[in-house]
Amino acid sequence: NGRRLRRELALSSDQKFIVASAGGGRSGYRLMTSVIDACELLRDRLPIRLEVFTGPFMEKEEFRNLTARNTADFRIRRYTKRFLDYLTAADLSVSLAGYNTCMNLLVTRVPALVYPYSRQQEQPLRANRIKTLLPMKMLNSADIQPVPLSNHMDQLLHHPEIKDAPSVDFNGASNAARFLDHWVDESVINM
């Protein structure tokens, strides 16, 4: 639950909570570094708290470089079992555009900045489709420099584009079970 997590983290009501994530971590170092740099600029303008989840597969050296930047308001970790709670509690998500993260963004509806991994066609395609359903902005390589990124973050924190909840059915498992039950029943009848 997002409100409970905000209480656990002792976030003040005026503090903006930002969650940055790199999926598995193999290709997220540049973005995570830029997010931390941008948040250093942003905290001069407003009170923020940053949680960075690098993913379990980020190179050890890269992870060490990031964790060297831990502060009271910036915490860098590999992962959390409560990622959905963190997104639900967040005022903003900054991430790559991997499948799991995008599905989590759809469920939590948190305003998001996504930087699709350009070496995979699916991430830009997915992000382009999902941005029509959420308060989301797609970033390019120029956008992830610290100054423009901090400006994009500030903009979305203060003026998220409100969109109607998407008409997405998140009950895939139960729908599949119902379909299989129906299919098996039909197969038995037709035997």
Regions found by a protein language model. Name each.
Residues 81-125:
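A donor-sugar binding/catalytic signature common to diverse glycosyltransferases
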Residues 78-82, 100, 143-148, 168-171:
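Short beta->alpha linker loops
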Residues 21-22, 53, 95-96, 114-117, ...:
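Thr-Gly-centered strand-to-loop micro-motif
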Residues 150-191:
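C-terminal amphipathic helix plus adjacent low-complexity
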Residues 29, 61, 84, 103, ...:
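Alpha-helical elements of the RecA-like P-loop NTPase motor core of helicases
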Residues 3-92:
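Donor-nucleotide binding loops and adjacent catalytic segments primarily
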